[in-house]
Amino acid sequence: MSAATHSPMMQVASGNGDRDPLPPGWEIKIDPQTGWPFFVDHNSRTTTWNDPRVPSEGPKETPSSANGPSREGSRLPPAREGHPVYPQLRPGYIPIPVLHEGAENRQVHPFHVYPQPGMQRFRTEAAAAAPQRSQSPLRGMPETTQPDKQCGQVAAAAAAQPPASHGPERSQSPAASDCSSSSSSASLPSSGRSSLGSHQLPRGYISIPVIHEQNVTRPAAQPSFHQAQKTHYPAQQGEYQTHQPVYHKIQGDDWEPRPLRAASPFRSSVQGASSREGSPARSSTPLHSPSPIRVHTVVDRPQQPMTHRETAPVSQPENKPESKPGPVGPELPPGHIPIQVIRKEVDSKPVSQKPPPPSEKVEVKVPPAPVPCPPPSPGPSAVPSSPKSVATEERAAPSTAPAEATPPKPGEAEAPPKHPGVLKVEAILEKVQGLEQAVDNFEGKKTDKKYLMIEEYLTKELLALDSVDPEGRADVRQARRDGVRKVQTILEKLEQKAIDVPGQVQVYELQPSNLEADQPLQAIMEMGAVAADKGKKNAGNAEDPHTETQQPEATAAATSNPSSMTDTPGNPAAP
C-alpha cells in the first residue's frame, strides 16, 4: 500500500508541483478514496487538505474549511468545499473529517464542545449512511480514532462538527482523507503513523478494524462510539495499535450490552435466546450487563437465572443453573421476565445447594399443594419412591426400565454421603420416579396437556442429569449414565403410550398410584391433580395446577405469570 500511496502522492506532489516544493517534513499523499491529494506534516504529525505551500493561513483556514482544505478545495474539486458534493468519496466515507491539522490546532477545542452532540448527530447520519459508512466510515472512524489519538479529539470534534454543520458530506471527505491519511500514514511506516498521531498501527491494520466497528458502531455503538472515541482515546493510542481488538474493547462497552442480547456467541445462545425472547427479562436481570466486566459476571448469573426462567417455560433446562438454558431461552415467554429476576435469587440457592432440585420440587408441589412436605426430604422420598416405582412397574408391566431404574435409586439413596454429584443425580431420579409413575398412569394423546407436561419435565430432568458434573468420579458418572438411560426409557414409554392409548380412561384408576407418587414428584402431583381435575378440565382447573407446577420449577414466585405459562405449555393440553 505504501508504495501505491507514495507513488500517487508523488504524482500529486508533482501535479501540485506547479507550486514550489513542499516545506521540509511535509508530504503529499493521494486519498485513495477520493483521489484528492492531502498533505502530511511529519513535524506535527498531522494531515490536512490544505497545501502548506499556499500561505500558511491554509491550516488556519481549515477551521473555516474544516470539511476540506479551503484552499485546496479550490485547487481540488471545489466539490470538497461544497461538502455535499464530495461525489468522489466512496459512499461510506461520510463521517470522519481528517482535518487533524486545522481541527486539531484550532477546531479541536471548538469541536470538542460540539463533538458530543455533533457526534451523536453524526452518528445518526452515519447510521443512515451506514451502507456508505460501512466501507470507509468505519475505517475512517476507527482510523480517525487511531490517528487521532492526538488528533482523535480533533477528528472526533471535527467529525462531530462537520456532521453537525455539514452533515456526512463534509465529514465524508475528511473521513476519506482521514482514512486515507491514516491508511497512507499507516502505509508510510513510521512517518505516516507518526503524522497520524503516532498511532503506530501496524500498517495492515488501517481499514480492517473499521469494518468490524461498522457493524457495531452503526447500531449499538453509534451513540456510544463517539463516547468510546473520546473515552478511549487515551487507551486507544496503545490499544489502537491492535486495531480490531481496540474496537472490540471500545465497543466492549457498547458491544457487551449488545452481545448480551445477541452478540456474544454462547451468551447469545443462552442469553441471546433468552434475550431475544426475554430480552426485557434479560435486561432486567443483566441490567449489570451494560458494563462488559459485569456482563461477564452477570453472564454467569444470568445463565443461572436464565435456566430458571427458562425452566418455567421450558422446565427441561432444569432449575440447575448448570442446565443449558441457552437452547431453552428462546422458548421463554416474555411474561417470564419477572420470574427470571426472581429466579436469580432462587438460582443462587440452587447453585449453592446441589440438591436444589428437591427445593424446586417443593416449589413445584407447592402450587399443586398436594404434597409439598415429602419433596423436602429427598432421601426418604427417594427410598419410598423406589417401592412406588416398583408398584408402578407392577401396574405397568411394559415399564421394565423403571424396574431397572428402581434399584439404582435405593443405591443412590445410600450414596448421598458419597458425593454431591451423586446426591444431585439422586434428587433428579426422585423426580424421575414420580414422572415414571405418571407415565405409567398416563392415558391420552400427545396433544394432552398431561403428556406435554410429563414430556417437558422428563426432558428437563434429562438436562439436569447432563448438567451434573461428575468431577472425574466414576460413581457419579455411572449414576448419571443410569439416570439418563432411565429417563430416555421413560420418554420412549411415554411416546408409545401416547400413540397406543388415545383415551384417558385409566387415569381415574391410576389416580391413587399418582397420589402415592406425588410425594416424590411434582409430576405425580400433576398427575393426581390432573386425574382429580379431569372432570373439571373444562373449568380449566387442571391447567392452573399444571402451569403452576411448571412455573414453580421455573420460579415459584412467578405465580403471577401462570397465565403465560399456561398459554405456552398448557394450551396444547387444553383439548
Swiss-Prot record:
<dbReference type="GO" id="GO:0046827">
    <property type="term" value="P:positive regulation of protein export from nucleus"/>
</dbReference>
<feature type="modified residue" description="Phosphoserine">
    <location>
        <position position="269"/>
    </location>
</feature>
<feature type="modified residue" description="Phosphoserine">
    <location>
        <position position="289"/>
    </location>
</feature>
<dbReference type="GO" id="GO:0005737">
    <property type="term" value="C:cytoplasm"/>
</dbReference>
<feature type="compositionally biased region" description="Pro residues">
    <location>
        <begin position="367"/>
        <end position="381"/>
    </location>
</feature>
<feature type="compositionally biased region" description="Pro residues">
    <location>
        <begin position="327"/>
        <end position="336"/>
    </location>
</feature>
<feature type="compositionally biased region" description="Low complexity">
    <location>
        <begin position="532"/>
        <end position="559"/>
    </location>
</feature>
<dbReference type="GO" id="GO:0101031">
    <property type="term" value="C:protein folding chaperone complex"/>
</dbReference>
<dbReference type="GO" id="GO:0034605">
    <property type="term" value="P:cellular response to heat"/>
</dbReference>
<feature type="modified residue" description="Phosphoserine">
    <location>
        <position position="377"/>
    </location>
</feature>
<keyword id="KW-0539">Nucleus</keyword>
<dbReference type="Pfam" id="PF00397">
    <property type="entry name" value="WW"/>
</dbReference>
<dbReference type="GO" id="GO:0097192">
    <property type="term" value="P:extrinsic apoptotic signaling pathway in absence of ligand"/>
</dbReference>
<dbReference type="GO" id="GO:0010664">
    <property type="term" value="P:negative regulation of striated muscle cell apoptotic process"/>
</dbReference>
<comment type="subunit">
    <text>Forms a ternary complex with HSPA1A/HSP70 and HSPB8, serving as scaffold subunit. Component of the chaperone-assisted selective autophagy (CASA) complex consisting of BAG3, HSPA8/HSC70, HSPB8 and STUB1/CHIP. Binds to the ATPase domain of HSP70 chaperones. Interacts with BCL2. Interacts with phospholipase C-gamma proteins. Interacts with DNAJB1 and DNAJB6. Interacts (via BAG domain) with HSF1; this interaction occurs in normal and heat-shocked cells promoting HSF1 nucleocytoplasmic shuttling. Interacts with HSPA8/HSC70 (via NBD). Interacts with HSPA1A (via NBD) and HSPA1B (via NBD).</text>
</comment>
<feature type="modified residue" description="Omega-N-methylarginine">
    <location>
        <position position="139"/>
    </location>
</feature>
<comment type="function">
    <text>Co-chaperone and adapter protein that connects different classes of molecular chaperones including heat shock proteins 70 (HSP70s), e.g. HSPA1A/HSP70 or HSPA8/HSC70, and small heat shock proteins (sHSPs), e.g. HSPB8. Acts as a nucleotide-exchange factor (NEF) promoting the release of ADP from HSP70s, thereby triggering client protein release. Nucleotide release is mediated via BAG3 binding to the nucleotide-binding domain (NBD) of HSP70s, whereas client release is mediated via binding to the substrate-binding domain (SBD). Has anti-apoptotic activity.</text>
</comment>
<feature type="modified residue" description="Phosphoserine">
    <location>
        <position position="136"/>
    </location>
</feature>
<keyword id="KW-0677">Repeat</keyword>
<feature type="region of interest" description="Disordered">
    <location>
        <begin position="1"/>
        <end position="92"/>
    </location>
</feature>
<feature type="domain" description="BAG">
    <location>
        <begin position="421"/>
        <end position="498"/>
    </location>
</feature>
<dbReference type="GO" id="GO:0070842">
    <property type="term" value="P:aggresome assembly"/>
</dbReference>
<feature type="cross-link" description="Glycyl lysine isopeptide (Lys-Gly) (interchain with G-Cter in SUMO1); alternate">
    <location>
        <position position="445"/>
    </location>
</feature>
<feature type="modified residue" description="Phosphoserine">
    <location>
        <position position="385"/>
    </location>
</feature>
<feature type="domain" description="WW 1">
    <location>
        <begin position="20"/>
        <end position="54"/>
    </location>
</feature>
<feature type="modified residue" description="Phosphoserine">
    <location>
        <position position="198"/>
    </location>
</feature>
<dbReference type="GO" id="GO:0043066">
    <property type="term" value="P:negative regulation of apoptotic process"/>
</dbReference>
<dbReference type="GO" id="GO:0008625">
    <property type="term" value="P:extrinsic apoptotic signaling pathway via death domain receptors"/>
</dbReference>
<keyword id="KW-0488">Methylation</keyword>
<dbReference type="GO" id="GO:0140597">
    <property type="term" value="F:protein carrier chaperone"/>
</dbReference>
<keyword id="KW-0007">Acetylation</keyword>
<dbReference type="Pfam" id="PF02179">
    <property type="entry name" value="BAG"/>
</dbReference>
<feature type="modified residue" description="Phosphoserine">
    <location>
        <position position="386"/>
    </location>
</feature>
<keyword id="KW-0622">Neuropathy</keyword>
<dbReference type="GO" id="GO:0016020">
    <property type="term" value="C:membrane"/>
</dbReference>
<feature type="cross-link" description="Glycyl lysine isopeptide (Lys-Gly) (interchain with G-Cter in SUMO2); alternate">
    <location>
        <position position="445"/>
    </location>
</feature>
<dbReference type="GO" id="GO:0001725">
    <property type="term" value="C:stress fiber"/>
</dbReference>
<dbReference type="GO" id="GO:0021510">
    <property type="term" value="P:spinal cord development"/>
</dbReference>
<dbReference type="InterPro" id="IPR036533">
    <property type="entry name" value="BAG_dom_sf"/>
</dbReference>
<dbReference type="GO" id="GO:0061684">
    <property type="term" value="P:chaperone-mediated autophagy"/>
</dbReference>
<dbReference type="GO" id="GO:0045505">
    <property type="term" value="F:dynein intermediate chain binding"/>
</dbReference>
<dbReference type="GO" id="GO:0098840">
    <property type="term" value="P:protein transport along microtubule"/>
</dbReference>
